[in-house]
Amino acid sequence: MLSMPLMAQQNHASDSKAQNKALRDSLAAATNVLAYHPDSIDLRLKKAAWNIQLEQWAYAKDDLDKVLFLNNTNIAGLFYRAFVNEKMKRYNFARLDYQNLLVLVPGNFQAQLGLALLNEKDKHYTEAYDGINNLIEQYPDSAMAYAARGGIEKERGMLELAEYDYAKAMSLDEDNQDYRINHIDLLISLGRKQDAYTELEALIKKGVAPGQLQDFYRRLRDIRRK
């Protein structure tokens, strides 16, 4: 993980507190209104969304269960509950929600991506890789799909394949720093020092402070000593 300067950390903490307070205020207001309109799907979805942002998974699931009791084909309800079930490590339930969602909206990008990543997390490795490969076939211009496959390959130690996929993701979304950072990490792991230096220079030109990249430079120096 990249280090963050102390001042930036303090500012980030302050912003997070203010944001959490605003979310809690919105949540409290929605809860009060919901007491008078218990069958409002829209209100329950809004409340669940705020619960999710506050990482209150059980509360979010309760509201999403009620949404889907009222309308078992509600697309937003299925998508959010799949996400929440995954966070609660209820993988089989999450998988079922994604599968039901794909019955309603065949080929949906987010549902297919969520299902592939869930299968990877739940060690259904063949299904995960087949799923992400199918997604890329359907959405060949999606940087997110290539990055997701790169992430899977990186976790499995398939570094050369992962490097290719992150490079492809970067070519499709040149301004995404996360893709570039993962790509640099892979280049260093593969011993491709000059390529890594080139990518680091590109990040600095895009405004990233050199101090935030010091861990990468340290790793490159360590390679030279070996």
Task: Briefly describe each language-model feature range.
Residues 41-42, 75-76, 109-110, 143-144, ...:
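Helix-start (N-cap) detector for alpha-helical repeat units in TPR-like alpha-solenoids
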Residues 6-58, 62:
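N-terminal leader/linker segments that initiate helical-solenoid repeat arrays
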Residues 53, 87-88, 121-122, 155-156, ...:
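Register position in tetratricopeptide repeats
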Residues 32-36, 65-69, 99-103, 133-137, ...:
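Conserved structural position within tetratricopeptide repeats
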Residues 11-14, 21, 186-226:
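Terminal, low-structured helical/coil segments at or just beyond the last alpha-helical repeat
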Residues 46, 80, 114, 148, ...:
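Canonical tetratricopeptide repeat
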